Regions:
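Charge-rich, low-complexity N-terminal segments
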Residues: 1-142
């Protein structure tokens, strides 16, 4: 049986660093991230939709705006995390080094299930563009 999929695109601006990166990405820096948020369902609603796009906007895009937009995202094991948090409450952490791959993973494995728990959809894949030339994806494997 197939699945229906819809994609909502959303852009935020935030900073990060890749702890122990071998070149300049080890430094604090920022991106204009573009997220491609793919939601899936085996069934359509009574109007023939996976879900109204406004629901994705109200839940997932709002979460991104509230939690990551104009914030500094660091790995919770990064020595800079606790030091920067003392200076600025806009520093947030995730349980992995905040590469594009891991940010996508965090959304699919942690945020999506929390936000969509009562809905008949799954956040099945996130593609994250760091630049117009570089992107990374994470998807639920079937």
């Amino acid at each position: 049986m197939g699945k229906y999929q819809v994609v909502r695109k959303h852009e935020i601006h935030c900073g990060h660093r890749v702890y122990q990166h071998e070149s300049k990405c080890r430094n604090l820096h920022g991106h204009s991230y573009v997220f491609h948020l793919k939601c899936s369902s085996e069934n359509l609603d009574s109007l023939g939709r996976v879900i109204d796009f406004s629901v994705i906007k109200e839940l997932l895009c709002k979460w991104l705006d509230d939690n990551w937009d104009h914030k500094m995202i660091l790995w919770d094991q990064d020595p800079l995390f606790t030091e920067l948090l003392k200076l600025d409450s806009s520093v947030v952490s995730i349980p992995y080094n905040p590469t594009a791959e891991n940010l996508a993973r965090y959304l699919v494995e942690t945020v999506g299930p929390q936000l969509f728990a009562r809905l008949p959809i799954t956040l099945s894949e996130v593609t994250l563009e760091e630049t117009s030339k570089c992107s990374a994806s994470y998807a639920i494997s079937n």
